[in-house]
């Protein structure tokens, strides 16, 4: 194992955990309305938080776009998922205009935010030091912890709910990491992640 890659993978785990803790702490400081309860009186605070949350993911996105993984991705693999995202956004605007903010939340904050942090940065760094299985296990534990911890701290969830979020995060990490590696593009896991969560929100 390359010691430099091993060291970078440890740093990546630490950075992502710090990002998670700060993000959740900020959400606790700035109480937020859930998407279903947005009104003219509370939407500004929600937008402010979401903009800051999106901005916090920019450094992770930048590391991906500077990486060899992005440069070696074929053009169609880069463009097709983003084209489909544009189609989805258009359809939501026409069919469900009252859910447009929720769609962009799940696309930018959940899809882009989580995938750039966990696949575009963490998984990519782990893969330099470990094989796919080990990378998914380590990344999955962090991804599961992120969901369980935020659910507990922000929503005060039950033990069953926390364990469900933790397990779902691990399974999600496996699925999205496999999609990322198979497609060699961050666009596909972003699209699928955002669509799954948005559909879950609608249901």
Which residue stretches match the model-derived regions?
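Hydrophobic alpha-helical transmembrane segments
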Residues: 1, 19-33, 51, 55, ...
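N-terminal, membrane-interfacial amphipathic/helix-forming hydrophobic leader that caps
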Residues: 1-69, 198-203
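Membrane-interface helix-boundary motifs at transmembrane edges
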Residues: 2-5, 66-77, 123-131, 180-184
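Residue-level signature of transmembrane alpha-helical entry/exit and packing/kink sites
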Residues: 8-16, 42, 46-50, 78, ...
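Juxtamembrane "helix-exit" motif on the non-cytosolic side of transmembrane helices
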Residues: 25-37, 91-99, 148-154
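Membrane interface segments of multi-pass transport proteins and intramembrane proteases
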Residues: 30-41, 73-74, 126-137
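Hydrophobic, membrane-inserted alpha-helices
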Residues: 83-91, 173-174
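Transmembrane helix-loop-helix hairpins at the membrane interface
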Residues: 96-203
């Amino acid at each position: 194992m390359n010691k430099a890659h091993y060291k970078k993978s440890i740093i990546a785990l630490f950075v992502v955990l710090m990002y998670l803790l700060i993000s959740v702490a900020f959400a606790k400081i700035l109480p937020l309305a859930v998407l279903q309860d947005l009104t003219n009186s509370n939407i500004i605070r929600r937008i402010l938080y979401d903009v800051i949350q999106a901005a916090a993911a920019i450094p992770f996105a930048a590391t991906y776009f500077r990486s060899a993984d992005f440069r070696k991705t074929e053009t169609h693999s880069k463009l097709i998922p983003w084209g489909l995202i544009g189609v989805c956004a258009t359809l939501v605007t026409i069919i469900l205009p009252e859910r447009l903010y929720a769609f962009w939340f799940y696309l930018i904050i959940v899809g882009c935010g989580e995938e750039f942090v966990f696949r575009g940065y963490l998984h990519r760094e782990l893969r330099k030091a470990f094989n796919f299985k080990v990378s998914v296990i380590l990344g999955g534990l962090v991804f599961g912890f992120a969901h369980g911890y935020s659910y507990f701290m922000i929503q005060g969830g039950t033990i069953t709910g926390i364990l469900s979020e933790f397990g779902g995060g691990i399974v999600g990490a496996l699925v999205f990491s496999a999609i990322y590696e198979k497609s060699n593009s961050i666009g596909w896991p972003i699209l699928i992640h955002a669509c799954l969560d948005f559909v879950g929100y609608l249901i």
